[in-house]
Regions:
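Residue-level marker for buried hydrophobic side chains located in beta-strands
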Residues: 3, 64-66, 206, 227, ...
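Active-site-adjacent C-terminal substructures of enzyme catalytic domains
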Residues: 216-343, 348, 355-359, 378-383, ...
Length: 391
């Protein structure tokens, strides 16, 4: 047994537990125990002193990120996947692991039924090829097609659909166990039945690309909607006379709030305010598109042109479409804006696990894990935040 000292655990903003800890490691390098420093000395129950593996000097430890909204990368768009893309998909998953991401919910934006089902079949095959050191494919995130036309953003109008059980079955029949989330507009006629069916299937339902007002959002939350997709974007804004879905979600306190922390989708001030208003609800997502991992410039997105500049993706008409930034870049930016490192890390590494019921807290996410699979976060004297493999 070895022990690492002076380690910090990320926690939500305002959580008083973010102080320095011991980490106990097995001979194989797995974390076997975590305890606050000062509560016990550096010895085991027989009084034998544990070998000291060194001090981390207040650095943070975390699992790798979980990205619940990522649309592709390295030139692959998940809704366009075909069987011959499998090798490139595995390459992308390896790339994501090297970018600090443990698992993703591959996001399938609004598209035709046949391409959607074809993409889910490719993802099913890829899941069987998972191995250590490769980003894991969770269930898919279906973002559409049951979206409000007035809030569709970059989603193609021709593939939007009215919600119904028949339309749902046509799209997901046979793949029900391989879907983690679905984003929809709950105010649409027929959405209530779809929400109920998704909940029966243990699929998390998110409100997004929606024109719902606060009262409509409240009804949706009562019916089981548990998340907002890219908060602030493609929904009514947060206003002092019209709180909208975001205001209602913050009031309740139990709705996850997906946040794109690139500084373009949401102004840094609003991102920090959201974190302060709803510290345990904020979940950092990338919303990365197919050009993630590629250079800025002109790229293709289905039949459209995607213009990428400094990590921001727009259609030719200027419509904001997504980013090409890694998820953990959002951690660095939110930490810089807020001057709160631990909460920013928590929002990308622990909070997403709660949404899809992988684990409920930081210690649960760390105990039993190989140190080499985890991340160590260091803030230098200039305030810059960096991460590296923990071992």
């Amino acid at each position: 047994m070895r022990r690492i000292t002076n380690v910090r655990l990320p926690a939500p903003l305002g959580d008083a537990t973010e102080h320095q800890h011991w980490l106990d490691l097995s001979t194989e390098g797995r974390i076997t125990g975590i305890s606050p420093m000062g509560r016990e000395d550096n010895s085991n129950s027989q009084g034998h002193r544990k070998p000291d593996a060194g001090s981390w000097n207040g650095d943070w430890i975390s699992p790798r990120g979980i990205d619940l909204q990522i649309n592709g990368g390295l030139g692959l768009a998940f809704p366009e996947l075909v069987p011959t893309d499998l090798p490139r998909l595995l390459e992308l998953l390896d790339w994501l692991w090297s970018d600090g991401v443990e698992a993703i919910a591959p996001t399938l934006v609004t598209c035709g039924i046949e391409p959607l089902r074809g993409a889910m079949a490719v993802l099913r095959e890829a899941r069987t090829l998972h191995c250590a050191g490769r980003c894991q494919l969770l269930g898919a995130h279906l973002e559409g097609p049951f979206l409000a036309e007035s809030r569709r953003g970059a989603h193609p109008r021709e593939h939007l659909a009215s919600p119904s059980l028949a339309a749902l079955e046509e799209r997901i029949g046979g793949f029900e166990s391989e879907i983690a989330l679905m984003t929809l507009a709950p105010e649409l006629v027929g959405a209530d039945a779809v929400i109920q069916r998704l909940r029966e299937l243990k699929i998390t339902v998110a409100l997004g690309h929606s024109a719902a007002k606060a009262d409509g959002a409240a009804k949706a939350f009562e019916h089981g909607v548990g998340m907002l997709t890219h908060a602030f974007n493609a929904m009514p804004g947060l206003h002092h006379r019209a709180p909208g879905p975001l205001g209602e979600a913050c009031r309740r306190g139990d709705i996850a709030l997906g946040l794109i922390a690139d500084g373009v989708h949401v102004h840094p001030t609003m991102a920090v305010l959201l974190q302060r208003l709803a510290p345990e609800q904020t979940v950092l997502v990338s919303d990365a598109l197919a050009p993630y991992g590629l250079a800025d410039g002109e790229h293709r997105w289905d039949k459209r042109v995607l213009l990428v500049n400094n990590g921001t993706c727009r259609l030719e008409d200027g419509t904001l479409a997504g980013v090409t930034l890694p998820q953990l870049e959002g951690v660095k930016r939110l930490a810089h804006w807020s001057q709160e490192v631990g909460p920013a890390i928590w929002s990308a590494t622990v909070a997403p696990r709660r949404v899809i019921h992988i684990s409920d807290g930081i210690q649960e996410a760390l105990i039993g894990q190989q140190l080499s699979q985890l991340l160590r976060w260091t803030q230098n004297d200039a305030g810059d935040l960096h991460w590296a493999d923990a071992a």
